[in-house]
Regions:
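A short helix->beta-strand "capping" segment at the edge of beta-propeller domains
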Residues: 1-16, 49
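WD40/WD-repeat beta-propeller blade N-cap
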Residues: 11-18, 57-63, 98-104, 140-147, ...
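Loop/turn segments within WD40 beta-propeller blades
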Residues: 22-30, 67-72, 108-113, 151-157, ...
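A short beta-strand motif characteristic of beta-propeller blades
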Residues: 7-11, 51-56, 93-97, 134-140, ...
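WD40-repeat beta-propellers
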Residues: 42-45, 84-87, 125-129, 150, ...
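Beta-strand-rich domains and repeat architectures in extracellular enzymes and scaffolds
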Residues: 11-40
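Conserved strand-to-loop turn within each blade of WD40 beta-propeller repeats
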Residues: 36-39, 77-81, 118-122, 162-165, ...
Length: 327
């Protein structure tokens, strides 16, 4: 196995940089992957193969953030057209469009899919009730610059957000107040809550920081050889992956921080990386307009990686047409 090289599956179809992505949980139909792109057209794919399922048509500006609910029945997107939209992931139909006063950078579903959180350049975190879409949203104020990411956590009793004001903040939904705050020396580029809810993964400058999700105490922090735009912790917490400005996708040991391997496949900076819910692969999105899927264990028979030995699979095994219809 040692002589096997990593052959990512390349998912084309976007026409501009891919800036964010999200996986659903494992469903009876497998799991799914959604990508945010500056072309304004989020795409839904089968998560283990990258096969294109459909494109959500309706935004009039770059899409900055995307989310899938757990069972992949709903998708959400936040965009430069000042809206956060919720979509039926089966039909592609737009279900809700929530108007904001500035660019919506981040969207996230609650566990029960009844609520949508948004973070925008208005410096406000909002929660919309999808069962009462006309109702006034809950609002959380305190950030002093545009918000990059917002995520439900602690069983949806709280939200965690990070912003251009170089802070990470935790919001208590019952009081509507900020209850914890952490300052960083540089802008936090990415934020992830681990699948079991116990660890926050934050990237800033060339660092990846892991925080205890209750106390916000630093569990560990490692430096990466480049400005790191995104990092993701494996579901079993043995390894993490990171990507940034030097076009490489890195894999590190979570305990020691030692680099295990790195791969160059993209032709532009890597903007986002994320492990699949089963941990068998990780996806990366880049300035080059592509998504790539990488095997966690190189050579394992999984998804479209059917060869363990012998010829490598075609790097463009998965492509979708440049112009694709709505779902």
């Amino acid at each position: 196995m040692a002589n096997l090289r990593q052959t990512p599956l390349t998912c084309s179809g976007h026409t501009r940089p891919v800036v964010h992505l999200d996986f659903s949980s494992v469903t009876k139909y497998g799991y799914f992957l959604i990508s945010a792109c500056k072309d304004g057209k989020p795409m839904l794919r089968q998560g283990d193969t990258g096969d294109w399922i459909g494109t959500f048509e309706g935004h009039k500006g770059a899409v900055w953030g995307v989310a899938l609910n757990k069972d992949a029945t709903k998708a959400a997107s936040g965009a430069a057209d000042f809206t956060g939209k919720v979509w039926d992931a089966n039909s592609g139909e737009e279900l809700h469009s929530f108007q904001h006063k500035h660019i919506v950078k981040s969207v996230n579903f609650s566990k029960d899919s009844a609520l949508l959180a948004t973070g925008s350049n208005e410096k406000i975190v909002r929660i919309f009730d999808l069962n009462k879409p006309e109702a006034k949203p809950e609002e959380f104020t305190g950030h002093t610059s545009g918000i990059r990411h917002v995520i439900f956590f602690r069983n949806d009793t709280h939200l965690v957000s990070c912003a251009d004001d170089k802070t990470l903040r935790v919001w208590d939904r019952s009081s509507g107040k900020e209850v914890q705050k952490m300052d960083f020396p540089s802008i936090p580029n990415s934020l992830e809550v681990s699948r079991d809810g116990t660890v926050l993964t934050v990237t800033h400058s060339n660092h990846v920081t892991f925080l205890d999700s209750e106390s916000l105490n630093k569990i560990r922090e490692f430096s990466v050889p480049t400005t790191v735009n995104s990092a993701s912790l494996h579901p079993d917490k043995t390894i993490f992956v990171a990507g940034g400005d030097d076009l490489k996708v890195y894999k590190f040991d979570y305990t020691t921080g030692n680099e295990i391997e790195s791969f160059k496949g993209h032709f532009g900076p890597v903007h986002c990386v994320k492990f699949s819910p089963d941990g068998e692969l990780y996806a990366s999105g880049s300035e080059d307009g592509t998504l790539r899927l990488w095997q966690t264990t190189i050579g394992k028979t999984y998804g479209l990686w059917k060869c363990v030995d012998g010829p490598q699979i075609n790097n463009d095994a998965i492509t979708s047409p440049k112009e694709v219809p709505a779902i």
